[in-house]
């Protein structure tokens, strides 16, 4: 199942990352470090190096340690400070509230109360988060906050 940022129809994550709903409106998603390789496995494209007399040892294989969620979805790290993140969040929430007003207006009071609680914690610990946008890099789209939690 894909989870989308609805305003810009961007896939943010899938259920393979074990999402869970927090405070009725937010998702926390598990992610891990993994190694990504640039080496192309010729067998996946129909090549048979040993049968064709080719030696694939000359192929340059660069690998890097990546966060699986970031790598799989093309997220781009964005250097927000707290002030600029607050401004972005205010703009994003305004658009979300307008959408809810049209679709499910009875959820607005709950959204506002949960957002106020959730953002207090985020703002208090903002220096522990890394910010990402989706591959569209649209400045009005959702910002993904990543915080590493030990023991989960």
UniProtKB/Swiss-Prot annotation:
The entry's keywords: Calcium, Cytoplasm
The TCTP domain, residue ranges: 1-152
GO molecular function ontology, one term from the record: calcium ion binding
One protein family per Pfam: TCTP
Main location group: cytoplasm
Metal-binding among keywords: no
Alphabetized PANTHER family for the sequence: TRANSLATIONALLY CONTROLLED TUMOR PROTEIN-RELATED, TRANSLATIONALLY-CONTROLLED TUMOR PROTEIN
Protein purpose: Involved in calcium binding and microtubule stabilization.
Protein name: Translationally-controlled tumor protein homolog
UniProt source species: Schistosoma haematobium
